[in-house]
Curated annotation (Swiss-Prot):
Protein family (similarity comment): Belongs to the purine/pyrimidine phosphoribosyltransferase family. PyrE subfamily.
Subunit note: Homodimer.
EC number: 2.4.2.10
Pathway: Pyrimidine metabolism; UMP biosynthesis via de novo pathway; UMP from orotate: step 1/2
Designated name of the protein: Orotate phosphoribosyltransferase
Positions of 5-phospho-alpha-D-ribose 1-diphosphate binding: 30, 76-77, 103-104, 107, 109, 128-136
Biological-process GO terms, alphabetical: 'de novo' pyrimidine nucleobase biosynthetic process; 'de novo' UMP biosynthetic process; pyrimidine ribonucleoside biosynthetic process
Keyword Transcription: no
Length: 234
């Protein structure tokens, strides 16, 4: 089944490629796997790029129907992501939400503590780039629980749909599916790997000479997903 693309999702994929955030080729991951693509949200590194990125996060939130009282960005990459998402929600969706982030180490002086910005109260929506192992999300859940708040969900840029590995081999679920199962909360992504693949296949079918190399990238991503990934419903 072809993954359906909303117009904003197609624009996001093109934006990520143009900014050098989404690359195709051969990349060795920390796990030792050779991936046919690489996604590094840290390369959204200009004011204009970050502002536009926030609008994509805001569109994903609006499209998902998720409701929240506070946005939270896990240190470090999540900090600018939550900030730009809060600005975009206020400017483009008339939703003026407070936001917060954590310090890696609690401050002993001044007000102290490890939360900066708004108090964690009510429904907290976590904003991050990707979920690889789920470790950062589990740490955030401890902060949310300690504050007496509840997690409304997680919003990320890309769902890699990739299964981790343990001593028994490939896990049955992706890291995102594990987080969803463990905490019973939704994880929303601007795009999924299936949608990136659908985008490549669409470009390839248009037959532009400049897009001929996309065929091999699409084939490589499909093979990688079939080996290490999970299929999503719908």
């Amino acid at each position: 089944m072809t993954a359906q693309l909303q117009p904003y999702q197609r624009e996001f994929i093109e934006f990520a490629i143009d900014e050098g955030v989404l690359k195709f080729g051969e990349f060795t991951l920390k796990s030792g796997r050779i991936s046919p693509y690489f996604f590094n949200a840290g390369l959204f590194k200009s004011g204009r790029a970050l502002a536009r990125l926030g609008r994509f996060y805001a569109q994903a939130i609006a499209h998902s129907g998720l409701e929240a009282d506070v946005l939270f960005g896990p240190a470090y990459k999540g900090i600018p992501l939550a900030t730009t998402t809060a600005v975009a929600l206020a400017d483009h969706h008339d939703r003026d939400l407070p936001f917060a982030f954590n310090r890696k180490e609690a401050k002993a002086h001044g007000e102290g503590g490890n939360i900066v910005g708004a108090a964690l109260a009510g429904r907290v929506l976590i904003i991050d780039d990707v979920i690889t192992a789920g470790t950062a999300i589990r740490e955030v859940m401890q902060l949310i629980d300690a504050a007496g708040a509840e997690a409304a969900g997680v919003v990320i840029a890309l769902d890699r749909q990739e299964r981790g590995q343990d001593e028994n081999g490939l896990k049955a679920q992706s890291a995102i599916q594990e987080v969803t199962s463990q905490y019973g909360m939704p994880v929303v992504s601007i795009v999924t790997l299936d949608q990136v693949l659908a985008y490549l296949e669409t470009r390839q079918s248009q037959g532009d000479e400049s897009d001929q190399s996309l065929r091999q990238h699409a084939d490589a991503i499909r093979a990688y997903r079939d080996r290490y990934g999970v299929r999503l419903d719908g």
